[in-house]
Each structure stands twice: as C-alpha cells, then as structure tokens.
C-alpha cells in the first residue's frame, strides 16, 4: 500500500513554522462511539495517550477500567488505564490501538511507540514540514 503525505500543523494561529508539529487525522472507534481527532505523532512517547474527554466520547467509563497504567514524564502523577480502540487513518486498513486513557483532559491525543509506530511506518521531512505514513509491511 502506498504512503500518504501530510503537512505539519500549527498548534495555535499566528505562531511561526518552528512551532508546527506532526498532527495526523485519525478516526477512533469502539462499540460505543466514534471520534475524529488530530493525533500528535510523538516518537519519544512510549505509549499512545488518550485524553479523558476523548475516552468518554468513545463510551469508556472510568470506574469500570481494570488495567492500571503507570505513565512517565509530565503525566507521571496522573492515573491512567489501558484501553483498546479501533483506529483508522484515511483509507488505510483499520488497526487495533492500545491507549493509556488518562484523567488529564489538557493533553493532546498522542500516538506513540506502543503501538501506533508498531502498526504504521512514518517518515518525517521536517525541513519540508511534511511527513509520510503507511501501514506496516505485513498489513494488506
């Protein structure tokens, strides 16, 4: 399957190109809901991170979660639980994505090493402010 190219996005209007980041449009689904969001591609993040409000929109109930996750860095003191959702990027095949669903609402949807970068090949062309994404080779 061919790759798709995306442009870097500015987080806030009026900022310089130095503040542009790699945000990827992605659709997340569960049996209880579906959302379209912009996920921050973060090669330095060990895990995918799902903000609290997005988890609620997908139909998750905090009190019913049973798989605690310990986050690191700026989220180290915030409780999180492991959840699985179906993810779709453009016309690529859907994949199961594991997220650390955090109670923090002020964090972006983060696509990290586990397991976004295990499901997709990503190539960054920062000097051109673009990046390419394609499904991993074994995915047809």
Region spans (language model):
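Pepsin/retropepsin-fold aspartyl endopeptidases
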Residues: 1-140
């Amino acid at each position: 399957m061919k790759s798709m190219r995306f442009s870097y996005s500015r987080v806030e209007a009026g900022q310089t190109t130095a503040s542009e980041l790699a945000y990827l449009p992605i659709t997340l689904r569960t049996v209880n809901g579906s959302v379209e969001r912009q996920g921050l591609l973060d090669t330095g993040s060990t895990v995918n991170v799902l903000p609290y409000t997005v988890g609620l929109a997908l139909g998750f109930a905090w009190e019913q979660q049973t798989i605690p996750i310990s986050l690191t860095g700026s989220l180290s003191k915030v409780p999180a639980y492991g959840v699985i959702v179906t993810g779709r990027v453009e016309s690529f095949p859907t994949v199961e994505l594991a997220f650390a669903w955090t109670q923090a609402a002020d964090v972006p949807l983060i696509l990290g090493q586990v397991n976004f970068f295990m499901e997709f090949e990503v190539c960054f062309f920062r000097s051109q402010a673009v990046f390419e994404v394609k499904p991993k080779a074994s995915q047809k």
